[in-house]
Swiss-Prot record:
Its EC number is 4.1.1.11. Gene3D superfamilies: 2.40.40.20. Keywords: Autocatalytic cleavage, Cytoplasm, Decarboxylase, Lyase, Pantothenate biosynthesis, Pyruvate, Schiff base, Zymogen. Its cofactor is pyruvate. This is Aspartate 1-decarboxylase. It catalyses: L-aspartate + H(+) = beta-alanine + CO2. It comes from Rhodospirillum centenum (strain ATCC 51521 / SW). NCBIfam families: panD. The gene is panD.
Length: 152
């Protein structure tokens, strides 16, 4: 088994940090649904401003708010206005990489989804596992995307 990215929020802005809350990251559930991130799912967080890297779990905030709030100890690593990357992962076999289609959301000001991308692993002419990033923003209704199944 290998650990791979399953969903990613790339360039989302931290809207708050609550040191006194008991852990987690609070995210807009509409954003999570577009990417395929579930409540209580563990995610990795990488702070582009400071370089800090942490792991915590997701809880849902107000739908449509664009919220991205670090809670508890995580609040020490990310402050309001920091730009972060949030990645969900899963364990899978290399052969399943051909069917796994992770969604990556990029953001504009106010944490509005700018683009919807998809990672694609395919058999190339020179190697068994090749890689490309596809922009599916115009090809699919990003707001109507169903969460990505974690298990087959």
């Amino acid at each position: 088994m290998i650990k791979v990215v399953r969903a990613k929020l790339h360039g989302i802005t931290v809207t708050g940090a609550d040191l006194n809350y008991h852990g987690s990251i609070t995210l807009d559930p509409e954003i999570c649904a577009q990417a395929g991130i579930y409540p209580m799912e563990f995610v990795e967080i990488w702070n582009r401003n400071s370089g800090a890297r942490i792991s915590t779990y997701v809880i849902f905030g107000e739908p449509g708010s664009g919220c991205c709030i670090l809670n508890g100890a995580a609040a020490r690593t990310c402050q309001r206005g920091d730009v972060i990357i949030i990645a969900a992962s899963e364990y899978t076999t290399p052969d399943r990489l051909y069917t796994l289609k992770p969604r990556i959301l990029t953001f504009t000001a106010g944490n509005r989804v700018d683009r919807v991308l998809r990672y694609d692993v395919f058999k190339g002419p020179d190697r068994a596992f090749d890689f490309r990033t596809l922009d599916i923003t115009a090809g699919e209704d990003a707001a109507a995307l169903e969460p990505v199944p974690i298990l087959d």
